């Protein structure tokens, strides 16, 4: 397998805890995993072992890539069944899950998914719009799955709710290879955003007490608990 050099180290993938009704979604998850491995990129994801989450994490892990899953303790019984792959960090809630996924990642990719995937995607886009981060965000538009979302965003631009320049805060493509190429070439949109340094200073001033995390290191069932 030919290795392709990347400017990233860790990619956060948002995706469904369901596999969807069509095989193209599972194929896209497997293709994305292969693209990550080809570029020696580590995977950060929502920690589940079911649906597209399970497929992409298994494929990356079995190909020799590093996998980090981050999941709220409350969801562990629902989203983890059987084997897990790589390292899994249990956190307190959904807010901490998203914050930790963002902190551990250099860019973001959304596969098809439901409300949760959409919420995660739109939040990191909003963070980019506000200048909280300047990391690339990519939408894997498998067989037109996100066409209506893209149409909605175009409508928001046309009606003056999103600046035309900020329409390009994220990129989209129909396949993993093209999408990752666009992410590699991405340059941050700096039109009207608040300086990232101001957010970082405010975060240090208001830094909350760190929550306890539990780490599960396993490629079978959850076996080892380490309190941090």
Swiss-Prot record:
Disruption phenotype: No visible phenotype under normal growth conditions; due to the redundancy with other LOG proteins. The keyword Nucleus applies. Its main location: cytoplasm. Expressed in roots and shoots. Detected in vascular tissues of roots, cotyledons, and leaves, axillary buds, immature and mature flowers, fruit abscission zones and ovules. Optimum pH is 5.4. NCBIfam families: Rossman fold protein, TIGR00730 family. Belongs to the LOG family. PANTHER family: CYTOKININ RIBOSIDE 5'-MONOPHOSPHATE PHOSPHORIBOHYDROLASE LOG5 (PTHR31223:SF14), LOG FAMILY PROTEIN YJL055W (PTHR31223). This is Cytokinin riboside 5'-monophosphate phosphoribohydrolase LOG5. The gene is LOG5.
